[in-house]
């Protein structure tokens, strides 16, 4: 790759597999949320999970009329991921499951609940960002999009038995080369995957290259200069919670835009939609994607902010990085006219009171068309409003 050109920039994003310890924790927290929402749409949930060798601790603040078998649900999530035998260092059948769940503070609750639902206040103060770019068909940055797809492919060939020596824990990292803000290729591919003890390094490298990397990454972006780092330490037998402890909410950049956009700092998993850390970040993505889909900008970043107990956002900011077809002020006016960004308004707009959250907890919350915040149904209205 012609990296001596002054116009060429490198940008890198990473992803992790569903078997990464932090992602195990995220999936357990969101599985608890989903089970509660099935029974109690008005529940208030803030569920945190910690996993380490031989144990999972589920805690947080939950106010609900629902009953959930936390122990069996936690074991089922761990089993579904693939930790089903003690040989892996973490076993759904034998690990301890500890329950440390309490109730939400009434001080918070009085600022959120209202007789008029549209007056529902934000569950906390905070800032949230949403982003979209037209460099991929899902209007997401390419590095994080394809890093996620590598991890999805790793899980697919692991669970199908095609590469039977694969284990659940894995990480990917992609460095893309850009010239004048256009992708010209992939400069580096990093993929580390947990594996069975008996597999040889040569077999592992060949298997990962042929079954994971080549079927996933577009060949037009790969060339003789692309560098590959497959299990560069040479050994990755001990992984999952035996290798590292895992905690809900510790992969916020993997969950969003891979560092290509700013982040407000709030994690998503385990939080019901009254928490604007989660729901307003989804709404900000919906707004940004709608603007790009409407052709009003090639790139768009939205910032929202809220005050606890207050319904209306305290600010809305638009940045189009010089790619806007209209002014940022015009876009802000269009947002106010077309999107209800009050907590209850955005929950209704995106139909967020439904059990869809466990699926978000691995492979990214954005760029996956099954989620309602990925719709572009308002793009035409934005175009016509000009």
Swiss-Prot record:
Pathway-wise, it operates in:
Amino-acid biosynthesis; S-adenosyl-L-methionine biosynthesis; S-adenosyl-L-methionine from L-methionine: step 1/1
Q: Which residues bind L-methionine?
A: 61, 104, 244, 275
Residue positions binding Mg(2+): 22
Q: Name one GO molecular function term.
A: ATP binding
What is the name attached to this protein's record?
A: S-adenosylmethionine synthase
According to its UniProt record, this protein's enzyme class is transferase
Localization (cell): Cytoplasm
List the record's Gene Ontology CC terms alphabetically: cytoplasm
Q: Which residue intervals make up region (Flexible loop)?
A: 104-114
Q: Which Pfam families match?
A: S-AdoMet_synt_C, S-AdoMet_synt_M, S-AdoMet_synt_N
Annotated positions binding K(+): 48
Subunit structure comment from the entry: Homotetramer; dimer of dimers.
UniProt remark on cofactor binding: Binds 2 divalent ions per subunit.
Q: What does this protein do?
A: Catalyzes the formation of S-adenosylmethionine (AdoMet) from methionine and ATP. The overall synthetic reaction is composed of two sequential steps, AdoMet formation and the subsequent tripolyphosphate hydrolysis which occurs prior to release of AdoMet from the enzyme.
State the similarity comment.
Answer: Belongs to the AdoMet synthase family.
